[in-house]
Amino acid sequence: MLKFLVRQQKIEILEREIIASDQIAFVTLKFTFDGDWKKFHKVVQFTQCDETYNRVLGTDGLSCLLPAELHAGAVKMSVFGYDAENTEGLRATTVPVTLNIRQSGFVGEF
């Protein structure tokens, strides 16, 4: 499990582990947010090679699974939040952090 603290517009890595490619629904990412983020509907974005994958945390969610579509290499991860009740388009964002995925030893078609 990887753990992160989101404070204002910065993501701090609290616990890091080695991530291997070819996983499916195996790597959990857990988030803690400061009070500024409480009202927001939260989404985690993973970007690799011009592809972006969104994982919805919602307003109460604190964890998500690493997208299986990601492969070995660097991945940029950021969080954004929005207030669905704010008609003026309030949005919170973070500076991305880099996660490194290592090539796994998996061979097969499972």
Regions found by a protein language model. Name each.
Residues 1-108:
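N-terminal assembly/attachment segments of tailed bacteriophage virion structural proteins
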